[in-house]
């Protein structure tokens, strides 16, 4: 999990934000989070999510996703099917990349990345994203349309949808970036680990800024897989309740833009001080 790390001088005084923090064995400068976006079942945008948390409103509801007939609650993001990817990226069209597009468009995040691209150059911005199942739903849907020989339909594009890397590939094409692009798929730790990957890349000079975050979308594999393990709750999950009885599967997207503080267009209120 990401965690802050405060550095101190030999005299015990707190160091300022420009002092070094440590990531593994690499000393790096703290990185500024200059833009961010968030889409969950609570709503689209940071404010919608904050409002739901303040009013204790849940986004979990009885599952009505696709053909699923499980007695469980899910956190489905409304409106994903209405999102349209750019025409030039139509081969990437799948629920996971539409979820990504929704996250890129909200909270002014897209404008911030474009401004950074203009400032640093497209080859100096990296993309470091986490996902667990990527666009596997597209394969699940395509499987229903196999021909007599078992072939998937001709409009199915594995590389741009189901392939785990398709998420980073979609985002880099969406912003026309040519810096390093990485996807980490390590279950629930995926979106935490990419902060470390981005910090390392900036520290060693591979890029000057990075789009960092994660996207996951509902799919039959995750729902039926966790059901087969007996882990799904029939109610909205209550992880800290003595009577807790399982988990609830959800979906969403979250992005941040990481930059060195001295190069950011404006001062940031939040900084990444370390990962461990």
Segments from the language model and where they lie:
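Active-site nucleophile and cofactor-binding loops and adjacent substrate-binding regions
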Residues: 67, 99-103, 157-165, 182-190, ...
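A glycine- and small-aliphatic-rich helix-loop capping segment at beta-alpha/alpha-beta transitions
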Residues: 47-51, 140-152, 171, 201-204, ...
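Condensing-enzyme catalytic core mediating Claisen C-C bond formation in acyl metabolism
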Residues: 30-34, 46, 52-74, 236-276
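Conserved active-site "lid/cap" helical segment
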Residues: 23-26, 42, 47-129, 135-138
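Active-site-proximal alpha-helical scaffold in enzymes
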Residues: 110, 164-168, 172-214, 249-266
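Active-site-proximal gating segment of KS-fold condensing enzymes and close homologs
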Residues: 131-182
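Acyl-CoA/ACP chain-elongation machinery
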Residues: 206-228, 233-244, 275
